[in-house]
Regions:
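Nucleic-acid enzyme cleavage-core boundary/entry regions
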Residues: 1-182
Length: 182
């Protein structure tokens, strides 16, 4: 499991083997969960013989056949892949299964977009009225804003606010005809 390989395609094909699959899948989950930080470790419960041999090769430490769980430090896995294939762990994972997701970054961006939608709701002409506050709390509290964001329909919120802004404020103006609101 050591030694540098020249041809990246065929050399990296070994990483699709049984000994590597669960280890690299666990590493991918961990990196996506932490935003790509090479900190901490991943573990394999009930490892196969092939997995045990890979972990021995990566860590340089013998593990008996009776071992129930194997743990590998992500930094050690990254260093081993750099030594063996001249590729970092994130690069190998992207080559095998596509780009890594930055889940913390995605959550942060979604939270910021949700805050912008809330600001749009709060800027509505009727923001001080109880019916509007009830509606705003309902679509904020039941997950509607998040669903709209995730399916790419966030633009509907400003549209809805614009339509509701056309409704008259009591003692403000005469009522608008229904076709104007439609």
């Amino acid at each position: 499991v050591t030694g540098r390989q020249a041809d990246p395609g065929s050399a990296l094909d070994e990483l699709r083997g049984e000994g590597w699959q669960r280890l690299l899948a666990a590493a991918r989950r961990r990196l996506e969960r932490t935003g790509g930080m090479l900190e901490g470790a991943v573990g394999l419960t009930g490892p196969s013989e092939a997995e045990r041999r890979v972990v021995i090769g990566v860590t340089g430490q013998y593990r008996p056949e009776s071992v129930k769980r194997l743990t590998v430090d992500l930094a050690a896995l990254d260093a081993a892949l750099r030594e063996m294939h001249d590729r970092s762990l994130p690069t190998v994972l992207a080559w095998l299964h596509g780009p890594l997701r930055d889940r913390p970054g995605e959550r942060q961006a979604e939270a910021e977009q949700r805050d912008q939608l809330r600001a749009t709701l709060n800027a509505g002409r009727h923001a001080g009225e109880s019916w509007y506050a009830t509606w705003t709390e309902a679509i904020t509290g039941d997950g509607t804003l998040t669903r709209l964001l995730r399916r790419g329909d966030a633009r509907l919120v400003p549209w809805a606010v614009a339509v509701l802004d056309r409704l008259p404020v009591p003692d403000d103006r005469p009522p608008l005809p229904l076709p104007v609101l439609a």
